[in-house]
Amino acid sequence: MQHTKIAIIGAGAVGSTTAYALMLRNLAAEIILVDINDLRCKGEMLDLSDTLSFSVSSSINMGTAQDVRNADIIIFSAGIPQKPGQSRLELFTTNKKVVQTVFKELQPISPTTIIIMVTNPVDSLTLLAQNINGLPRTQIFGTGTLLDSLRLQGLIARALGVAEQSIDAYVLGEHGDSQFVAWSCAHIAGTPIASFADMTQEKLATLEQATRQKAMDIIACKGATYYGIAACVSLMCESIIFNQKRVLPLSTYHENLGVCLSLPVALGERGIEKTIPLKLAAHEESMLYRSVERIKAV
């Protein structure tokens, strides 16, 4: 993509940190922040503009939904964070209205725009965004379990004393309570992770639980997570802009399942290029279908 224009809808902690990550990685020629809170949006824009000397970005501005209809990439991070004790259905009901309102204002949207959904519950809201837009489903997808997978890889790396980049392991399914690790497909240089002497079934279960718990630990300490997800979104944008076709676990639509959930996909300049087939163990297949039912229940 030439002269990439990236719009970020929702200039809160996640959106503004994502803009910062994009600028430091020199991924956008133009970044536009959109938020219902004009004062907050202006403050973030002015603060971020101080980093332009360290970036090739030609500009960072604030605008409206109408200003970003022709953006190459739209990152959707607007919405209300989940409150303690709030059900996923309640959260979906709240953020559904935000998604519907914003996408109505975005019409007519450029037929080549790619939309990255970040707002939770991301699987259900990604499907909603697909259903209310005229774009191909391959151009609208969510961050899904990408951050969960990177957290898992970090934990495995520290346990085995290898680089995180050398680990091929994914968290799949719902971005939520029913997510699971596909241990049967996890390996390092072709060697199954489960075959390492240190990786007992108890250790694998501990790593999986630590992966699931990490977000809650962060929220308990500081109220929200945003650095990790911002880094994930910038990685996704890089794969799109440079047509890298990176294989990432993202929330995409699977016609045979009828929902959006995370499986490994190749991400390029046209969006989702293909889903990478996995040969899951029987119990992992069962966990995948449990995720499907959980998502459908929202």
Language-model features: locations:
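Aromatic pocket-lining residues of Rossmann-like dinucleotide-binding sites
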Residues: L22
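Conserved N-terminal Rossmann-fold NAD(P) cofactor-binding segment
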Residues: E30, V34-D72, Q86
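Glycine-rich Rossmann-fold phosphate-binding loop(s) that bind the pyrophosphate
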Residues: A11-G12
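Long, compositionally biased stretches enriched for glycine and/or charged residues
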Residues: A157-V298
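Beta1/beta-strand and adjacent pyrophosphate-binding region of the FAD-binding site
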Residues: T4-I8
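Rossmann-like NAD(P)(H) cofactor-binding subdomain of soluble oxidoreductases
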Residues: S87-Q153
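N-terminal Rossmann-fold NAD(P) dinucleotide-binding loop
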Residues: G15-S16
